[in-house]
Amino acid sequence: LWHVLLGRHKIDDVNGEYPDLTDGQRAGSFTRDIRVKTRTLPRDAAGRVVHHMYNSDAFWLTQWNLNVLWGLGWPEMPDEMSASLIRYADNGGLIPRGPCAGGYTYIMSGCPATPLIVSAYNKGLMRKCDPMHAFRTMQRNHMPGGMQGIGEFYLEHGYQPKNAGMTIESNFQDWALAQMAVRLGLEDKAAYFGNRSHGWRKLYRPDQQLLFPKDEQGQWLHDDPLRGTGSIEANAWQATWGVSHELPTLATLMGGYDKFCEKLNYAFEQAAPQDFVFGYGQGYVSYANQPGCSNAHVFSWGGKPWLTQYWVRRVNEQAYGGTTPDRGYGGHDEDQGQMGGVSALMSIGLFSTRGTAAARPVYEILSLIH
């Protein structure tokens, strides 16, 4: 839990001023030619600060840890962070993936702030920014030129060429935005972004029963489900289950819930001897990095919650059960508390495979680990 809170830092001073470094030119993952500005925090009619401004590591795939855990333990934080992220966009046009020194880093991919902001609103926690303004800001960032990083090809074909990982992320983010549109009564926007969230289906490969990357001509990039090419720090075995918004559809494509769970169970059996800890893009299941952090909970969506219970226990004991860096967090990508957040959720027996981003958020209940 200490790591879960350590990853965010206030950047505003006691007088309410904060640095704005959003005005500059993108150079790869960073920004150059920055024009530094000093801005002032918003205040209410009584002169009280409405919200603070924050730095953080990227919110990449935090729908499976921080978005859920913050709402349970520190419900003010999703509200604070959402308002801060929207303020960044007000200043510089883009919603940060991970705000750094008052500006952008472009580290990781997509618009990972969307599930965080949507979950804050759909759980009734958004108080410090206007929901409609937040929605319009995210909508702008889900179009070409926005932080989601999509182009016209994605809008036309539904998938990111040569990258199944980015497709899975973008589709989930589009689904999350559609869920907020439902709550706001924006039926046309809900339908539009909902339709965009189905593109991953074009990457389903029947002969492998997994999602694989395709190029612009619709050709598969490779045949190896354990190869990381076309994924982001993952592979087909790890990333396929990340279509959290449409797991029943994935099960149907695989031939039904029994085959769906049988395939996932095989992956866990293969990963268990290595304690579910692998390097980027390696192994069948990895709890050393973000892309697989929901996988053990997926069995519940396949009608076999006892397998979720079994593998959650195994993962929590083997991957997160130690007290040293190489045993407690898989010796890998803890980032801003994400692996610690997954372990905490496993221990308290609560999770949300959809990151509490649904129009009616749902928690999955497991047994408490004493």
List the predicted regions and their residue ranges.
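Function-dense linear segments that define catalytic or interfacial modules
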Residues: 1-54, 74, 123-126
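Glycine- and aromatic-rich loop/turn segments at beta-sheet edges
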Residues: 34-50, 90-101, 145-161, 205-225, ...
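Aromatic-rich carbohydrate-recognition surfaces in CAZymes
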Residues: 55-181, 194, 237-252
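Extended, well-ordered alpha-helical scaffold segments
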Residues: 76-86, 127-142, 186-201, 256-271, ...
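Catalytic cores of carbohydrate-active enzymes
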Residues: 96, 178, 184-292
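Carbohydrate-binding/catalytic loop surfaces
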Residues: 102-117, 153-164, 211-234, 278-295, ...
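Catalytic cores of secreted or luminal carbohydrate-active enzymes
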Residues: 303-318, 334-365
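Conserved small/polar residues in nucleotide/adenosyl-binding loops
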Residues: 369-370
